[in-house]
Amino acid sequence: MEAAGSPAATETGKYIASTQRPDGTWRKQRRVKEGYVPQEEVPVYENKYVKFFKSKPELPPGLSPEATAPVTPSRPEGGEPGLSKTAKRNLKRKEKRRQQQEKGEAEALSRTLDKVSLEETAQLPSAPQGSRAAPTAASDQPDSAATTEKAKKIKNLKKKLRQVEELQQRIQAGEVSQPSKEQLEKLARRRALEEELEDLELGL
């Protein structure tokens, strides 16, 4: 069945070419006015409520469609009507991949549970006093390393601020008449450097 044709221009005006009906009969060629739009091409009006409900997701946020979709038994060969061999192969491949993924997730969950149970066994109160004290000493090390890192950052920021202040004094004194792009960027970052320095000093 051919779709309704768009208006075509001729010497005598516009016309819609003849089209075939679903029952096999033909519609006659019709002349139309300038600017005529066929009924099939007129967009359907939708108010804002209809648009809102169409765009609204069917599932709650965070819930994947796979979790709610019912598991359908795989059809036998040739049981899927209207599908080509390639489409059937793709379906089989997807089904196999899904089964492998589910199996992998189950194995990962089992390994995680085993690991948790082993950790709980290792943390029983029967452990000697010395072995309990060891993790505490180890946990102090990251804190001291973080403090050292902050101190280095503070020193670095103070150095950068000192350079910015010196540059500003040189510009005000007339030593630098035309500051370069990099020098102007340094001056612009002064406030950001000061704020970062304050945050680090408060965090110590």
Curated annotation (Swiss-Prot):
Region (Required for interaction with MAGOH and RBM8A): 1-33
Lineage: Eukaryota, Metazoa, Chordata, Craniata, Vertebrata
Compartment(s): Cytoplasm; Nucleus, Nucleolus; Nucleus, Nucleoplasm
Species per Swiss-Prot/TrEMBL record: Homo sapiens (Human)
Quaternary structure annotation from Swiss-Prot or TrEMBL: Interacts (via N-terminus) with MAGOH and RBM8A; the interaction is direct. Associates (eIF2A-like region) with the 40S ribosomal subunit and the 48S preinitiation complex.
Region (Disordered): 1-32, 55-151
Origin: domain of life: Eukaryota
Function of the molecule: Key regulator of the exon junction complex (EJC), a multiprotein complex that associates immediately upstream of the exon-exon junction on mRNAs and serves as a positional landmark for the intron exon structure of genes and directs post-transcriptional processes in the cytoplasm such as mRNA export, nonsense-mediated mRNA decay (NMD) or translation. Acts as an EJC disassembly factor, allowing translation-dependent EJC removal and recycling by disrupting mature EJC from spliced mRNAs.
Primary gene name: PYM1
Biased composition (Basic residues): 86-97
Pfam families for the chain: Mago-bind (PF09282)
Modified residues (Phosphothreonine): 72
Coiled-coil residues: 82-116, 145-204
Record-level GO BP terms: exon-exon junction complex disassembly; nuclear-transcribed mRNA catabolic process, nonsense-mediated decay; positive regulation of translation
Gene Ontology CC annotations of this record: cell junction; cytoplasm; cytosol; exon-exon junction complex; nucleolus; nucleoplasm
Protein family: Belongs to the pym family.
N-acetylmethionine: residues bearing it: 1
A molecular-function term among this protein's GO annotations: RNA binding
Annotated transmembrane regions: none
Region annotated eIF2A-like, chain positions: 152-204
UniProt keyword list: Acetylation, Coiled coil, Cytoplasm, Nonsense-mediated mRNA decay, Nucleus, Phosphoprotein, RNA-binding, Translation regulation
Free-text comment on this protein's domains from its UniProt entry: The eIF2A-like region shares sequence similarity with eIF2A and mediates the interaction with the 40S ribosomal subunit and the 48S preinitiation complex.
Residue ranges, compositional bias (Basic and acidic residues): 98-118
Skewed-composition ranges (Polar residues): 138-147
Protein name per the record: Partner of Y14 and mago
Residues with PTM Phosphoserine: 6, 64, 117
